[in-house]
Structure formats: structure tokens, C-alpha cells
Amino acid sequence: ADFPSAEYPGLIPQAGPKSRYRLIHWWYWLFERLWSLRGMENALMDFYLYPGQIHQLFDKLTDFYCRVLERGKSERAADGLFISDDIGTQKGPFFSLDIFREFFKPYYKRLIDKAHALDMHVWMHTCGNIELFLPDLIEIGLDVIHPIQKYTMDEAEIAKKFGGQITFWVGFDVQQIIPYGTPQEVAQEVRHLVDTFARKDGRF
């Protein structure tokens, strides 16, 4: 089968009004796309069994996403791209730092560099404990990270170590407080997140 074309009409989702910051979105960056095609067990083994093919896939995907950025800028006057890649579990990352640096970091950096060249930001959603990868994500210029998942990392420690180096778009506790909490507990959670992550320059 042919690789999907980034020139399809209507490929770029609608954005908000031009008077506001305009964010386009695209799910399934690299790892999510890999395991959606190969299954989780195969995907995790592929880094060791078929490294060349993984690089080939990630390179093609990055070409595709870079074109999405170009179209988002020209067709939607987008200010940023919100993209997802769940690379963490509740307990830790899916793979080692060495795997991340070989297979993910170069392609993440290429997309982020492309966005910055277009005067755009990259917002990344990634569930799970990804503290191990945060210094590298900051190094390659990621602008916004979401959500610093509850119960996977020490929120206060993350804010202390990395605050001022990257913008945190922090997420609510969607496993306990949102589905089961009282209105008071929801309000307390909001207060906790603001107190933990708020910065003087107005960004989380």
C-alpha cells in the first residue's frame, strides 16, 4: 500500500477564530502510530529486531507531519500543533533512554525545528511517567508538555526541576477526582495544580 499523502484535501482540521491563538491537532505521532500498526508486543521488540525499518517508518512519518505543519500554517494560520505520543506507563517509560535517544529524539527534534522555523509551537500530549525524557524534550525545544499525569510523577518535584524551561499544560486527576470526587475535591485539585505549577509570567 502507498504511504498516505499529506496533500489530501481537508486533511488539516479546522482551528479557532483568527483573533485567538490557533492550535491544530494530530494524534498518533511515532510510538502510537507504530504500535497501532504492529501491536504493542511487536512494537517494543521491533526496536531490537528491525531497527532499520523503524527508522524508515519514523522518517516517513516525520516527513508527513512536517508537511502537516506547512499546511497548518498556510491554510489555517496556525500558531501551534498539538500532537500525541504516549511513551510512558503508570510506573515508568515504555523503553530506555537509549531507545528514546536513538529512535525518537532525532525525529521529534526535526518536527520541532520545522515548527519553530514556521513560527509555530509544538504541544505534546504524553500519558504516563516520562520524567526520564523531560531533559531531552526540553533540550530539543519542545514548547508545551501535557498532562504530567497524576500518580505517575511527583508534581511538586517536576515543577521545581523543570519549571521555567518548558510550559506545563497540567491535567486534572481523571482517574479518581473527576469521575468520583465531590465538587469540593475538584476545587481542591484545581487549587493544588495552580499552587504547584503557576508562574509569575502567567504560564503554567
Q: What positions do the PLM features span?
A:
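Active-site loop segments of alpha/beta catalytic cores
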Residues: 2-204
